[in-house]
Amino acid sequence: MQSLSVSPLTYTADRFAPQRRKTLRVRVGNRWIGGDEPILVQSMTTTNTKDIDATVFQTLELAKAGCELVRITTPTQKDSECLEEIMKKVRAAGCDVPVSADIHFQPRAAMEAVKWVEKVRINPGNFVDSKSATPRDYDDASFASGVQKVYDAFVPLVRAAKDRGVCLRIGTNHGSLSDRIMWKYGDTIEGMVESALEYLRVCEAEHFGEIVFSMKSSNPRVVVQAYRMLAARLDKEHKPYPFHVGVTEAGDGEDGRLKSSVGIGALLLDGIGDTIRVSLTEDPVHEIPVAKALVKLCDLSRIAPVPSLAESLDFYAFHRRKVPLLHLGGLAIGAREKIAVGAPDPGAESIPKGERRLEWTGTHDSHATRSIPTVWEPRSVDFAIATKHSLVALASSRLFSGLSDLPANLEIQVEDPAHLEKLPADVLSLPHVYWSCSISGEAGDNPVARYRHLNAWLARKGRPDPIILRGRSDGTPEGNMMLAARFGSLLVDGIGDLLYVSGPAGTKVCMHLGYDILQAAGVRRTKPEYVACPSCGRTLFDLQTTTQKIRQRTAHLKNISIAIMGCIVNGPGEMADADFGYVGGAPNKVNLYVGRDVVKKNIPEMDAPEALVNLIKEHGRWSEPEA
């Protein structure tokens, strides 16, 4: 297994003053992707493509909802042949939305599809090579032979696309890397990137540049790292092709929206992304307002820059920031402790005390914002100061003179990174300090960059102090998504030891939002994790109904992940991290997995949810719901 070499920071010009990545402008029908064009919102039909009228109807409904590009699955050549009639009917209805064909396994289907649509997506993991149940071994010669096979199979499609003015998307899926790529690069983001670049080299050999890339996974952290690495590689080689960004198999409801916000939002906030799709296990029309909201929320033109500092982070792998243990009353944060969750003091509000409990209320025995207390009791206390006020007064106060001798914690809340340089030197000698940034929620606020600046400044000062991520949501779905995008961007980089959420919705709602964001970012699990694909024409059972049934039976379980996948295209790969898998194996038949291994096959759809419950019980992972 080999590793790719990427310079420490090339995926964006400035992480503290983000601008949209400069890309080539690619034509798709009557629309453009990349360059200075607005970020384009797209979705995918869930109908059987051979049901031409149903597919046409859903395409028109998506266009009415504001979808700017519609993707249709074409798993076979017969499905691709249906595109001719579908396109005629869509255009006859007065709809000019560009259409993309989604291809897996079938170069012949791609050659048919390219005749009728404006864009064709291929998956490098299975267009020529594939993943087998028993991975084969390779050597350098057989690997090189595989590269030649890619050229031979792909070049006819490239030439046809070039002749017809059709765009190609080279769309890698983490769950379907081929055995050949896995042999050389392993199950890594390097493998995802190199898998795509093999196909780019074929395009370049044919002088074809109407290309869009994607790097998808059901894990938002993998998504962010893979797109960053691809951007770094392409920009280093002066090949700034545009990106289609998305988190695949995000699921449904608020969980699906938060997971998408963590992955897509974190990238958009760094200027990465030219077209997006939010993959929800719902009616695809529901995806459009979510995607449009993300684009609006992550508008970089409204975000103020923050002074840059050199960072010592690995932007392509997750490493949680190393900090010492700190006790906030009865709560331990930092070190190897789980990232904690805080919310405002509940007062008389009833708060649960189970796996999801209120771990910190964020209150201090004294909050020195406008004045510094000069007298205090010699006991363990928790103080806070805000940097916009006079810190010189802190250094000269009687409060400060005793802090270093007592088990007192001091929270320093940074409102402007420039204030950090004004901190008295003696403050940095205090033993029990933790840091946070205020978040105003106002237009132009850039908390992600301020937290990055704080983290870099602490590293430069040799202060591995805990950092509290403070955020506020107005309680709307959009407010929650914005918070997930901001927090997710930081959590992906290993920044944050406690997540504190406030807002008008109340302590319980804020607390659960904090836990949900941590789970969406993949850093702490406190309820079942569902990896559910959004359905498409390949789906072999009713995904939406089935997902709800499985949720109802298993929502009380703890520390378990369940994948619900409509077919075997990406199912076994994308659910690799899941404990149990529920995958369509044939029409109305389901295969059940434990980890990567299929253990039960061809279970009738009606019986499969109960069979999954029994499988969980057999492996000792079941518990009865609490009364």
Regions found by a protein language model. Name each.
Residues Q2-S43, V158, K162-R164, L300-G354, ...:
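N-terminal amphipathic alpha-helix/helix-capping segment at the start of soluble metabolic enzymes
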Residues K50-E61, F105-A110, A196, S260-I264, ...:
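Short, acidic/polar
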Residues T74-W116, A348-S350, L358-R379, V392-S397:
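N-terminal active-site wall of soluble small-molecule enzyme domains
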